[in-house]
Amino acid sequence: MSRYQATNEPTERERAKAERREALLREATRLFALHGYAGVSLEDLGAACGISGPAVYRHFAGKQAVLIALLVDMSKDIYDGGLKATEDGGEPMEVLARLVDFHTDFSLSRPDILQVQDRDLKSLPKSELQLVRKLQNAYIGLWTAQLAKLHPEATAPSHRFRAHAVFGLLNSTAHSAHSPRTKKSGMKALLTQMALAALATPVG
């Protein structure tokens, strides 16, 4: 190992700090989903991670900074995942199938963060809200580009409406997945089948 590589490895203290930050983000996601952003204090967040409320300031400037990190990072993750799903190209339905696969996996594995976005997005400052909206629009564009190829006779607003309808279907699991009566086994297959049918249905 070179001297350069050695000096760029994180120290034990840096690793511990990074782990604490990730723990705070995980607990914030859970607490915001359960109680809403307004219903959670820094003291609540710190207690969930075994630290005091003021100790949270070592990692974030405040509660709003936690929300910013959660929702901006989530929007980047979704866009990056969608971009990766389209990289190999192919027929429109093939690309859309990969997008559906990615989005369904995301909604089933991270229902809490989707619930936080749905309820607390408007609590972001204006600049961060604009960034999230920009990333969301870019992600929608990945879908509508394929829908335009699949349904060339339809209008751009129609493609956007269809994409949003599918998002509504897939994101609904962010709420139903919390129910103890809901079995995730078989849920992905059913959601995928329904989403693909909605995307493929010819324009009336």
Predicted segments, located by residue:
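N-terminal intrinsically disordered/low-complexity leader segments
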Residues: 1-19, 203-204
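Helix-turn-helix
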Residues: 12, 20-23, 27-65
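Amphipathic alpha-helical segments that line or abut small-molecule/effector binding pockets
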Residues: 26, 93-108, 160, 164, ...
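Short, structured motif recognition centered on aromatic/hydrophobic residues
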Residues: 32, 78-79, 96-100, 116-117, ...
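Alpha-helical DNA-contacting segments of helix-turn-helix folds
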Residues: 67-74, 117
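Amphipathic alpha-helical linker/stalk segments
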Residues: 72-97
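Short secondary-structure transition hinges
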Residues: 104-141, 175
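Hydrophobic/aromatic-rich alpha-helical bundle segments in the mid-to-C-terminal region
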Residues: 114-118, 129, 133, 148-195, ...
